Amino acid sequence: MYKRQGESRALAGYPVTPPALPRPVIFDQRWTDLTFIHWPVLPESVAGSYPPGTRPDVFADGMTYVGLVPFRMSSTKLGTALPIPYVGTFPETNVRLYSIDNAGRHGVLFRSLETARLTVVPLTRIGLGIPYAWSRMRMMRSGKHITYHSVRRWPRRGLRSLLTITIGDLVEPTPLEVWLTARWGAHTRKAGRTWWVPNEHKPWPLRAAEIAELNDELIDASGVQPTGDRLRALFSPGVHARFGRPCVVQ
């Protein structure tokens, strides 16, 4: 469970639980079998990638971070009751930075999102300004071992990502790991404006993840250059997430 506000100086004032979700609920879905891998990044090296009205979110150590996050998405609905046809269950892998806006909302800024569902790509690119890419993807699990594999089809055909992990024991997240995983929305750019797309979910149940193989081209292709050692990897069986009504940031 996440630490309460005030238990760590590094998290003082940080929203470790989601604020009230603006209604109506736009999407409802499950994220499962998810792995978090993170590297530190100098904030000034990525500041130019952020849309107007946002900037790199910086932890108490003076660094921002880039994440490689593969998982499986399922049970996507419009609102809370209407399943979206032709979507079903499919793997995704996202590369994300961490953002904050002038209203103090801490979110993520996606640099890319790999998906095996072609129909998702134009809908999210046009409708939400989220940079989805169409990829050939596989996710294989055998007991405590999971392999995530993707090969980009469009755009920038051929980009690859391969990750194999072994799931370990339950862990108590550090303040930095809370800061990285307790994110209640995404900043996007659409139609010349910056948007906040809010979400809510319960705290991530987190386990250690031992990396057996990591061969990734997506981080480099995103234009982000890590500046230090990789953090410990984390695995989660998943959460149920809801997205609320987007609002304009600037």
Listing of model-derived features with the role each one plays in the protein:
Residues 94-250:
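Internal, well-folded beta-alpha domain core
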Residues 32-38:
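Short amphipathic
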Residues 1-2:
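Short, small-residue-biased leader/transition segments that mark boundaries at the very start
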Residues 27, 43-93:
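Glycine/small-residue-rich interface belts in oligomeric ring/scaffold proteins
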Residues 10-11:
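N-terminal, charged low-complexity regulatory/assembly segments
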